[in-house]
Amino acid sequence: MGLVTPLQFYGMDINPFAVELAKVTLTIAKKVAIDKLNLTEQELPLDTLDNNIVCKDALFTPWVKAEAIIGNPPFLGGKHMRLNLGDEYVEQVFKQFPNVKDVDFCSYWFRLAQDNIDKTGRVGLVATNSISQGKSRKATLDYITDNKGHIHEAISTQPWSGEAKVHVSIVNWSYEQPQQYFLDDKEVSLINSSLQPHIDVSSAKTLQANCNKCFQGVIPVGKDFIVTEKQVKEWITKNNKNEQVLKLFSMGSNLAKNINGKPNRWIIDFNNLNLEDASDYKLPFEHIKNFVKPERDKNRDKKTREYWWKYGAKRPAMRKALAGLSSYFVVPRVSKWAIFVPAPFNWLPGDLNVVLALEDYYVLGILTSNIHRLWVQAQSSTLKGDTRYTNTTCFETFPFPQPSRKGEQPFAPTDNVIQQIRNKTIELHEYRTQQMEKKQWGITQLYNEYFHEPASKLYQLHQELDKLVMQAYGFQAEDDILSELLKLNFELAEKEKQGEKVIGAEAPKR
């Protein structure tokens, strides 16, 4: 007799065809096993699997306690659940899982698997790679590790072979602590809940010294706020007052692909103007009334419907922080390299931009260094192969060099080092600008070509900048940079808690 039979398998699906297909597959598998393994059990009668593989919703049906759980839960971002599943169903889910909201739909399966696995069993699930990030991570992989689970094998990210154009993570875990850990097919010493082999920086604290400096750009809510350059020229020619509400609109793609990141789109921006004042800009206002308002009238949000000429998210805090600056620094929210670049004050950043309301090239140098890159890679979220830079997890938690640290041995970057970082960053910026204009490339192509080439000027400038930033922190080559940064983050958070002043995104003063 075989040690495993179809009657030991259980499963659920809301698709009746998938349920029947699973039953047939198990029946065929039994026949194949008998033939290949020369088993003595009888092929007939067929096993009745109607009580094993059932057409039910796994989120609302008790699971059988199992020794092994495998599955491919549905991929659906938390923000899309209501649109795809309906309000009534989503409210039922929230009622069933009152402490788990705004997460990827597959997160609920991870929690149920953790709750229903045998103490000696194992689980293996596939999910979008956002499962190791933000709220989804807290609801799933943190839940597993906080409840005595051990992630023993995982693929952190790989393209999904199915229809969904996403990257996925594969996670295997158990209650029993493993002897070996394998991450991305390599043996590692451990796997944390961020699906990384090194120190987990997700516990880093928000530093108040970094707050109100870094922002996500505006969200118009209406594609027809965007207009052509031809329209802009015509409207300004007819009334130059219109120039006040017509702005170059910075998207993530222009920052990555265009020379110097220059936007190639224009947008109408009435900001906080009331209806009467907005209508004084006749041609732009008529355009919004004719093309944006009909779509806004269908919007579920009352405020969005009533204030149809205004953006869904105007970002007043960002605008206030940018007021008076001649330029600022900006990075695409999703990109391969996550490089901050200078932007003139008259670019209006969209929501695919993360904006730093500062002009000091010393700060840009710190954020351009490998030290910050390591932090971003450890903190950032991804959906495909690119890096998602967030103003909260990547920037507000990041500890900048301080006037004094390391206990009995006060350390501070000298004025000379601070100025050298500024100068080197300006040199790097000027070099990149010259190369982009010469080659007609965007910054992504420039970095793709030269960042990893030791003989390139780009590589050499980054190496020189990294050495200066290491000096600013007082780090040594043998230091575990992430560990040191996390330690510094905790130190600064504790100082802030005690009412002490710490240095955020600015040059320390001796």
What positions do the PLM features span?
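A short, glycine/Asx- and small/polar-enriched loop/turn
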Residues: 64, 164-167
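Class I S-adenosyl-L-methionine-dependent methyltransferase module
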Residues: 1-71, 77-81, 85, 111
